[in-house]
UniProtKB/Swiss-Prot annotation:
This is Phosphoglucosamine mutase. The active site is at residue 100. Its cofactor is Mg(2+). NCBIfam families: glmM, PRK10887.1. The keyword Magnesium applies. Belongs to the phosphohexose mutase family. Binds 1 Mg(2+) ion per subunit. It comes from Pelotomaculum thermopropionicum (strain DSM 13744 / JCM 10971 / SI).
C-alpha cells in the first residue's frame, strides 16, 4: 500500500482529503492504467448514497473521459454489484465511490479490474505514482476520441437477477427485517429477498444523503435487534453503507456475526462436499470459537491479516473458495469476486430453508469466547504502533491471560484508529486489560 491507497482503496474526508481535483486525477490515472490497452475502453462507475457522491462522481467521470475512456454509470449500487456489472458489461474496469461503513463525512474510491477482482498492490501503486506525478504522460485526446458517458438503466435489474440465481431456494414462509443502512442496498436488497418469496420489512431504507450508517446498518445493529422482536420476524439482516457485508439477528433479537455465519455456511458446504479444499480463510479478528467449531468438523482454517483483500489473496493461494471476516465481509468465490452482503445473506437463508432450523439453533454450532474490542482515535497510528512502551504493555497483559486468550492491537486500514481487541474466558478481566491498553495508547499519542 502507498500513501493514497489503503486496504480498501482511497479514503478520506470528502472535499478535504478526497477533493474533486484529486478524484479527477485518480480518474485520469486509473483510466490510463486500466483501460489503455483494452479493446473495449469503458469503465463502470457506481456509488453509495452519500451527499458527496455526486460531486466526486462528476470529477471522476471527467477524469476518465479526459483520458479517452467511456463511462458506464450505474448510479447508486452496492460495491459487489459493481464488481459483477464490470464483468457482465465486459468493461475494462469498475469504480466505486463509497466509504463503506464510515461516517457520512468520509468518502472513497476503489477500483475493480476487468475480471471483477480488486486491484493488486502493484497496480494501485502504478495509479498512485501517476497521480503524484500530476498524470504526466497521460494523453489529452480531442474531438471524437474523448470518452462518452452512458447511463445503464437496467443495472439494478441485472444485479437482482444475478443475485437471485445464486440462491436456489424459495424463501416463502420467512419474515425478514432488512436494515439497509440508508445506503447502497436500499432498493436492491429488499427486491432480492422479496423476489425469492420472503416477507420483507425494510428499515433504514430512506437515504437523504447524510443519514448513511447513522445509527443503523451492520455497525449499529441495535435498532434491527429491536425491530426483529417487535415484528415477530424469523430473523433480521443488517447491511452496511455499500452492502459488501452482512450481519444477522435471530428471532430473539440476538446478533449473529460474521464468524457465526461462516461456521453455519462452511459446515453446510462441507456436508454437501462443496467446500473447496476443505478450507476456510479468516482473519486474526475471528473468534477462537470459530477455529474450534470448524476444526471439530475437520475443516482447515487459514488465518490472514484484517481486510477482505488479504482474505481473497489467501483463498487464491490455498485453492479455497470461501472465507471472510467477523465484520460480515464474506466471500463466496463460486458466486462473486468480492465480499457481497446480499449473496452471503442468501447462502445463510438457503441453509435455514434446507435444514428447517431457525437461525438461533444454527448459530449455536459455535460457542463464542468473550471478546472485547475498543477503537481509539489517534493522530499518528505509526507512532503508537511502533512504541516500545505499548509493546511491553501488550506482553505484560498477555501473561495475565495465562495462555487462555489473546490480545490484538492493530491500526485501522481506513480510519485514524487503533483497534484494541482482547479475548479470553472472563469479560471482567478483558475490560480491565483493554482499559489499561487504551490509556497507554492515549498517553503515547
Amino acid at each position: 500500500m502507498g500513501v493514497m491507497f489503503g486496504t480498501d482503496g482511497v479514503r478520506g474526508v470528502a472535499n478535504r482529503d478526497l477533493s474533486p481535483l484529486l478524484a479527477f486525477k485518480i480518474g485520469r490515472a486509473g483510466a490510463h492504467v486500466l483501460a489503455r490497452q483494452s479493446p473495449n475502453a469503458a469503465m463502470v462507475i457506481g456509488r453509495d448514497t452519500r451527499i458527496s457522491g455526486d460531486m466526486l462522481e462528476a470529477a471522476l467521470v471527467a477524469g476518465i473521459c479526459s483520458a479517452g475512456v467511456d463511462v458506464l454509470k450505474v448510479g447508486v449500487m452496492p460495491t459487489p454489484a459493481v464488481a459483477y456489472l464490470t464483468r457482465k458489461l465486459e468493461a475494462a474496469a469498475g469504480v466505486v465511490i463509497s466509504a463503506s461503513h464510515n461516517p457520512v463525512d468520509d468518502n472513497g474510491i476503489k477500483f475493480f479490474g476487468a475480471t471483477g477482482y480488486k486491484l493488486s498492490d502493484e497496480v494501485e501503486a502504478e495509479i498512485e505514482a501517476l497521480v503524484m506525478d500530476e498524470c504526466a504522460g497521460v494523453p489529452w485526446p480531442t474531438g471524437g476520441r474523448v470518452g462518452r458517458v452512458r447511463q445503464v438503466g437496467d443495472a439494478a435489474d441485472l444485479y437482482v437477477k444475478f443475485a437471485c440465481s445464486t440462491a436456489g431456494v424459495d424463501l416463502s414462509g420467512l419474515k425478514i427485517v432488512v436494515d439497509c443502512a440508508n445506503g447502497a442496498a436500499y432498493q436492491v436488497a429488499p427486491r432480492v429477498y422479496s423476489r425469492l418469496g420472503a416477507e420483507v420489512v425494510p428499515i433504514f431504507n430512506r437515504p437523504d444523503g447524510i443519514n448513511i450508517n447513522d445509527g443503523c446498518g451492520s455497525t449499529h445493529p441495535e435498532a434491527l435487534m429491536e425491530a426483529v422482536v417487535s415484528e415477530k420476524a424469523d430473523l433480521g439482516l443488517a447491511h452496511d453503507g455499500d452492502a459488501d457485508r452482512v450481519l444477522a439477528v435471530d428471532a430473539d433479537g440476538r446478533l449473529v456475526d460474521g464468524d457465526q455465519i461462516m461456521v453455519i455456511c462452511a459446515r453446510s458446504l462441507h456436508e454437501k462436499g462443496l467446500l473447496a479444499n476443505e478450507t476456510v480463510v479468516v482473519t486474526v479478528m475471528s473468534n477462537l470459537g470459530l477455529h474450534l467449531a470448524l476444526r471439530e468438523s475437520g475443516i482447515r482454517v487459514v488465518q490472514t491479516k484484517v481486510g477482505d483483500r488479504y482474505v481473497l489473496e489467501e483463498l487464491l493461494r490455498n485453492g479455497a473458495r470461501f472465507g471472510g471476516e467477523q465484520s460480515g465481509h464474506i466471500i463466496f468465490l463460486d458466486h462473486n469476486t468480492t465480499g457481497d452482503g446480499i449473496l452471503t445473506a442468501l447462502q445463510l437463508l438457503s441453509v435455514i430453508k434446507e435444514t428447517g432450523k431457525p437461525l438461533k439453533e444454527l448459530a449455536g454450532q459455535m460457542e463464542r469466547l468473550p471478546q472485547l474490542l475498543e477503537n481509539v482515535r489517534v493522530a499518528d497510528k505509526a507512532l503508537v504502533m511502533n512504541s516500545p512502551v505499548l509493546a511491553e504493555a501488550i506482553e505484560r497483559e498477555e501473561r495475565l491471560l495465562e495462555g487462555m486468550g489473546r490480545i490484538l492491537v492493530r491500526p485501522s486500514g481506513t480510519e485514524p484508529l487503533v483497534r484494541v481487541m482482547a479475548e479470553g474466558k472472563n469479560m471482567g478481566q478483558l475490560k480491565e486489560i483493554v482499559g489499561r491498553l487504551v490509556n497507554i495508547i492515549k498517553e503515547i499519542d
